[in-house]
């Protein structure tokens, strides 16, 4: 499993429906990049100027909305994940 460093977060993207309301199946090239995901792992937090570690606001299991083109895509054990900074997360859902 991935263990992110610092203020980084590992997210598993949640894909939207692959079919339109009218029943048309969308090919991969027509799908938008997902912007929702579930937090899989979080880093230990960022280090402030005074050396103090500041914990992250998100935690494992949180469902989040993140910036469309944020992060780096990685593949581990045939699963795709996104590693991004906490500042790229826009909101926690629920």
Curated annotation (Swiss-Prot):
Reported function: Together with the chaperonin GroEL, plays an essential role in assisting protein folding. The GroEL-GroES system forms a nano-cage that allows encapsulation of the non-native substrate proteins and provides a physical environment optimized to promote and accelerate protein folding. GroES binds to the apical surface of the GroEL ring, thereby capping the opening of the GroEL channel.
GO terms of biological process kind: chaperone cofactor-dependent protein refolding
Swiss-Prot/TrEMBL keywords: Chaperone, Cytoplasm
Domain of life of the organism encoding this protein: Bacteria
Record's subcellular location: Cytoplasm
One GO molecular-function entry: protein folding chaperone
Similarity comment: Belongs to the GroES chaperonin family.
One GO CC annotation: cytoplasm
Pfam families linked: Cpn10
Full protein name: Co-chaperonin GroES
Subunit structure: Heptamer of 7 subunits arranged in a ring. Interacts with the chaperonin GroEL.
InterPro entries the record matches: Chaperonin_GroES (IPR020818), Chaperonin_GroES_sf (IPR037124), Chaprnonin_Cpn10_CS (IPR018369), GroES-like_sf (IPR011032)
Source organism of this protein record: Brevibacillus choshinensis
């Amino acid at each position: 499993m991935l263990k992110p460093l610092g203020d980084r977060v590992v997210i598993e993207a949640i894909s939207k429906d692959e079919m339109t309301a009218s029943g048309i199946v969308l090919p991969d090239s027509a799908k938008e990049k997902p912007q929702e995901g579930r937090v899989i792992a979080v880093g230990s937090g960022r280090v402030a100027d005074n050396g103090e570690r500041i914990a992250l606001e998100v935690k494992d299991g949180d469902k989040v909305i993140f910036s469309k083109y944020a992060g780096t895509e990685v593949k581990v054990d045939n699963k795709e994940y996104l590693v991004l900074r906490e500042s790229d997360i826009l909101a926690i859902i629920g």
